[in-house]
Amino acid sequence: MKKLILGTLLCLSVSIFAQSGSAITTVFQKIKNQSKIDTNDRVVYDLMDELYQKNLQAENDEMTPEFMHKMEKAVSDTNTKNMHLLYLLLMYQQHISQAVTKGKSPNPEFQIEIMSLLESETKEVYGKLPAIIYIFKAEALDSGPKKEEVKITVANGLKEYPDSVPLKVYSYLNTKDEALRQDLIKNHPNHWMVQQFGIK
């Protein structure tokens, strides 16, 4: 029953958030109240990190059926701790996917609201952020009128994850730093983001 309630809240939240980013706090609080919070359980943190490693940091998408099964299992298991964090991440990704599928731009207010919540909640539970949150937050801020905050987010992310190719790419795109460009074309010329943004 609990899984059904959480699933319903997730579906409801996506349709609500498509219209208004400010409604997220109310729905999220309901999801959080259903979640078992455990600062020592790293399953969700590790899933976020693995998603980053396989989908963003890797030269090419290295998502495997095994990882997808692991993610699905965590989402469907009512005993998964810190599920509220995983739901926020999935809401963000679903919103982006739905916008792309419909040929529309994602809602910047929604993206920023989700990532702000995910950032603060993840810090509260784990005391630190996985790299994927810095990247998604930078993307969210970049979609809205918060360009200076993008630079700050990327710089903070690079302090924690100096080898993060996606963060280096976003830093280069915002600063046009020649040393970063050289690093990317010398050390990561085949990375999908370097190629996507035509960094040469």
Regions found by a protein language model. Give the residues of each.
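Canonical positions in the second alpha-helix
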Residues: E121-T122, G157, L184
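Bacterial Sec-dependent N-terminal signal peptides
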Residues: M1-V27
